[in-house]
Amino acid sequence: MHFPNTKTSCWTKALAVLAVVSSPVMMGQEGIPDGVWVRPGFELSVAESSIKKPRFLEFDDRGTLYVSVPNKGMINACRDNDGDGAYESLTTYVEGYESGKILQAMQFYKGWLWFADMTGIYKSQDSNHDGNADEVIKVVGEDQLPITGGGHKWRAMLIHNDVIYTHVGDQTNATDEPIMENDRKKIWTFNLDGSGKALFATGIRNTEELCIRPGTDEIWGVDHDIDTLGLKLESKHPKFGQPITDHNPPAELNHYVKGGFYGHPYILGKNMPNLNFLDHPDLIEMASKNVIPEWVMPAHCSGNG
């Protein structure tokens, strides 16, 4: 998620996320999910409740809230016309993208709403401000982007300082292959016109959203780590379930830097070797190159934003 205004946007977007949640949950007073609260001095209300299974949010410079809905292959545009905190106007901004192609990533940048799915990276405009895109341009084509078969197909996209950053995760849980075997598990960069493809970082399993740390040029993201850390041990003792895998490895909050290697699938968390690759001849060398996470989170928590 991109936060252009470091003073207010983090709170605005965080509250908006809660406001548009529309999954079937226990609802408390005024439609707020039970257990959801905000700090003293803040107030939480429902801004829009009709969008089902929203994914990511983005604001433009006129206050329009865009909501990606991957299972519908569409983006909705929400407008608060009277300033009361609720969105009276809901339109379909773009539609017709295959649900299996996972339209999710969005960013408003230099007058255009950029978005991405498995087929490409696009930029769009609503020149007459009616809530519907009247111009959509494919900037980066499918032939330039990582292949998208298998799992972890959520394309991340970030634009900063006129550079496009994009990532698609590992096609399996932990694919053992040479680093440059394919374009996945990496962050790639492009110029704003789609030219100049360049490698930025490697060893990334599945970072579904890339962010700029407010007030800096730093690129951050949460990487969702593997699901079978203890497989070789636990499969021999099925009656014990998954005592290792249920709690390991941690999800990683990473600061992504140019040329950085982030360990996947061989090195996990704070330089812990993947138990499934203990016989790999380059394990120690890869550990020496691994960029240590800035922070670790509980296993399988799948954090974003």
Positions of the model-derived regions?
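Asp-box/WD-like beta-propeller blade repeats and closely related beta-sheet repeat scaffolds
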Residues: 90, 101, 119-160, 170-172, ...
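A short loop-to-beta-strand structural motif that recurs across blades of beta-propeller domains
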Residues: 74-77, 120-122, 186-188, 252
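Beta-rich, blade/repeat-based domains predominating
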Residues: 50-62, 96-112, 116, 146-163, ...
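Conserved beta-strand positions in repeat-built beta-propeller and related beta-rich domains
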Residues: 59, 67-71, 115-119, 166-171, ...
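Beta-propeller domain segments
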Residues: 30-40, 154, 171-174, 185, ...
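A detector of repeated loop/turn-to-beta-strand junctions in beta-rich toroidal repeat architectures
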Residues: 72, 87, 118, 133, ...
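Beta-propeller domains
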Residues: 66-86
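Short loop/turn segments immediately following beta-strands, especially the blade-tip
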Residues: 78-85, 124-132, 258-262
